[in-house]
Amino acid sequence: MTKLITCPFVFALAFASTLSLAADRPAGIPAGYTLLYEQNFDRPDALKDFVVSDAKAWQVVRSNGVNALALTRQSQYKPAVRSPFNIALLADRVFGDFVLDCDLIQTGREYGHRDMCLFFGFQTPTNFYYAHLATAADPNAHNVFIVNSKPRTNFAKLTTKGVNWGLNVWHKVRLERDTAAGTIKVYFDDLTTPIMLAEDKTFVSGCLGFGSFDDTGMVDNIRIWGPAVETKKTPFFTRP
């Protein structure tokens, strides 16, 4: 009769690995989601993962000991309809359902529309969504917007009065999309209570990205979770 010999060290190692994986998986990630993309801009060629609306406006910089993707100036880009000017999209990747986590810092002056944007469902430069995180909410700021072959239109069911970007402060930001339910949720620092809630099913998949309507800022520590990602060449914008 064959005996199964167990080794406490093997069990301990397996248990430690399981704990490590659990610790590395943020709270709130749905079952069945895996890590589809991760970027901290430590790779010299990290910028090659993106397409941008103006290559001269974006660069990888080192700030306070960490690398980040920086929007350093207003893009020389004229959208066909009223929508953000400064856009950096993850190239050749199409996402449906997802949870996007990242760190954002706003480096511009303080005013009501001081913003950073998260882009999603981006199918063409005139067909996409974006979440606009701004200091003060109004019909054109701090909302979830759709660009559907006409100037952007807000459609969030719930928003806060705005966010406090502060000066030289990094913020944890999360964007969630459930295409079956049509739900869109945006979180800012507190990843348990959304600052924006919206519903729409117009664009069920598309590119993800970062930017600003007309300000400057940086993004780092990008992690995207989801059930799947489609590889498809992005046919628009510039490759740095």
What is the predicted role of each segment?
Residues 24-55, 231-240:
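Extracellular carbohydrate-recognition regions
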Residues 26, 86-93, 158-165, 208-209:
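Beta-strand-rich interaction surfaces with strong enrichment in secreted/lumenal proteins
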Residues 45-75:
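Extracellular glycan-recognition surfaces and repeat-rich motifs
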Residues 150-172:
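Short, aromatic/His-centered strand-loop micro-motif at the edge of beta-sheets
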